[in-house]
Structures are given as C-alpha cells and as structure tokens.
Amino acid sequence: MSAVNSEATTNLLAEFQKLRGETIGLHSIFSEKSTVDISNLNGNTTLKRIEDSCEELKNEIREHVQVSSDELKSIRTANSGFLNKIEESLKTSQQEAREDLKAIEKKNESLLNKSLNELKFQKEQLKYVEATLISQQKLIEHMAKELTGKSISDMVKNNEDDGTHFEFSHTFNSVATLEKGVERRSELKEGCGSLNWFMSIKRERPSRKLLVYLNLDCEKLPTNNWIIEADIQCTLNQYYFNEWVRKFERKEDAIFKCENGEYTDKLVFNFGEYEEILRTFTKNGVWNIEFDVDIIKTVGLSKKKLRCFDESAAEVSDAVMIVKDEKFHVSKMFLAAQSSNFKLLFKNSNNSEFTLDGINSEDFQCFLELLYGEPALTGRLLNN
C-alpha cells in the first residue's frame, strides 16, 4: 500500500509541475501583449475571444490545482496514518526487546553470582586444606626434631642412598701383578634394601682382556624368586696431577635375578687389553673404578625396614594395626596426635587390635617410619 501511495503522489506532483510551467508561459505572453495598444489592433472580437479562452484556461487550471491539492492532502493523511502504525509497531518491538534484554541481564547476573559464590566456597575450601597441610607438616617436622634432633630436610639430605640409587668406588692395588684367571674383589656395598654388592676385576685366560664385574653377595641373597632391573654406569678413572680424574665411562642395562633359589647373573664390562689398561688407567699398579647404580624396578624384594614394629615393640605399645595379615605394634596416643582419623578410631572403640583396609603393608611401614622420625622420605619419594 505504501508503494501505491508513493507512486500516485509522484504522478500528481509531476502533472502539477507541468501545469505550473504552462501557466507561467501564458502569463509571460499576456505580459508582452499588455504593452500593445489594443485600439491599434484590428479584430477586437478575436482578441476578446482569446482573452475569454485564457480566462477559462485559468479557471480550469485553478480547479485542477485545487483537485490535485486535495488529493495530495488525502495521500498525506493516508501516509500519516500508515507511518503512525509503523511508529507504534516499532515502539512495541523496542519495548519487547528492552524487556527481553533486561530478562537476559537478570538471568546472567544470577548465574554470575552463583558462579562467584561457588568460586568463593572453593577458595575457602582450598585455604582450609592448605592450612591443614601446613599444620600437619609443622607437626611432623616438630616430631622429627623431637625424636631425632634433625629436621626432615636434613634427613633427606643425609639419606643420599635411598635404596634405589647408590654409588661406590674401589681402588685396586698391584694390578700389574694380577695373574691370569684370578678374580680380585672389592669390599661389600649395601644397596637396594639389604642386598650387598661388590665389584671385581679378572684377567682372562687365554685372552689378554681385563674384565670388570658388578655382582651380588650370594651369602645374603633372598632364597625366593626375585628380579632387579637397573641402569648401571661404570667409570674408569685416570690418575692425573695427583688425583683421580673421570676418564672413560660405559653404561649398561642390567637384569639381576634369582630363580628357585639359584642366582647366577652378574654384569661384565670389557674395557680392552690388559696392557693398554695398565698403560692408560693405572698409576704404579693402582687402578680406581666407580659404579653408579640406578634401580629401575624390583620384583620379590622388600625394602629394608628402618624401624621394627613387630613383637619386639610390643612392650612399648598398646595397639596392634593389622595390614594384609601383618601386625604393627604402635602407640594409640602417638598415632592419635598425628591424625584425626586415628583419634576417632581409638575413641569409638576399646579394642586393642584394628584392621586397616585399602593399604599395603610396605606403605604403612613407610608411613609409620616417617611418623616415628625415621628418614623414610627420600629424594625420589619426594619427587613422586
């Protein structure tokens, strides 16, 4: 409807402009004729007729202009009503949009407040957990100092041999007089629990090789089946300017194992000819060798206990904790002071024996050793 009204208005305006132009032309002609003396003209009747025609034309133009003006007013009135409807519709749409926007803002504000409250609650929980951990750490540190006179950090520093990594070296004398087929051994080195390790050298026969061995002391080996996987580095040191200097290194992946109580494995390093080693690495027949042992995995071997909680501790204990059929003799008062869980457990029961589920005996042994001030926290355990 808007397009039809616009087109009609345009047509009327164009016709009006055309009539206006014609009227201006006629007025111009009449202006020129007005300067001529009518008395000098012949044919007064003709002139009169022209004047009458012009007058009629003027009247027609006036009527036409009046009609066009009325139609234009009608169109304007119709357009005004249409524009009012559009304006009202626009106002209604704007109002609805504002209401929708307010509803969305209110909903988002509610969600934001809920999220902020949840974050605040989580932050408070985190602060509580952090404060609890700090409190427990201080308590354990205090207990460690009370029992051992050392802080936990000092115990970790002093506990370089954590059972999973150890180093040892040995200096062999009179290597130049070593006979073929004879094996010369070092002192024992304890590592990986209660196992004893040693190194040895042997001049092979009939070849001219000098071999270096890393081995386990068979006299103290467990008789059950077990396996040790390790990364081992052997270093030959050279005597240089009155000191031994690391000169030649070799690394090997090794597996030591015992099957049915029989141990036969040992690691062998072949560094070359006997005479070449004497020339390069010995000083007056003295030869220094180092081993760096990193235990990767053990199966069938238990960690060396730093404190006993067996029957020998029963006299100074008033409770027995049973973990996987293994009994640990402990003090109720001591454990209750370290843990609210133990405190609640002992408070709600008059029993002297308690069974703990969901934990293995080795982990509980380590836990008790830590509480009793033993250096159970090693560098590797802290990293894990």
UniProtKB/Swiss-Prot annotation:
Q: Which CDD domains match?
A: BTB_POZ_ZBTB_KLHL-like (cd18186)
Q: Where is the MATH domain?
A: 167-277
Q: Which UniProt keywords apply?
A: Coiled coil
**Coiled-coil ranges (or none):** 41-127
Coiled coil as UniProt keyword = yes
Q: Where does the BTB domain start and stop, copy by copy?
A: 317-380
SMART domains in the cross-refs: MATH (SM00061)
Q: Which domain of life is it from?
A: Eukaryota
**Does the record bear Coiled coil in its keywords?**
yes
Give the InterPro entries listed for this entry.
BTB-MATH_domain_protein, BTB/POZ_dom, MATH/TRAF_dom, SKP1/BTB/POZ_sf
Signal peptide (UniProt feature, chain positions) = none
From the record, give the cysteines joined by S-S bonds: none
Pfam families cross-referenced by the UniProt entry: BTB
What is the official name of this protein in its record? BTB and MATH domain-containing protein 34
Q: Which gene encodes it?
A: bath-34
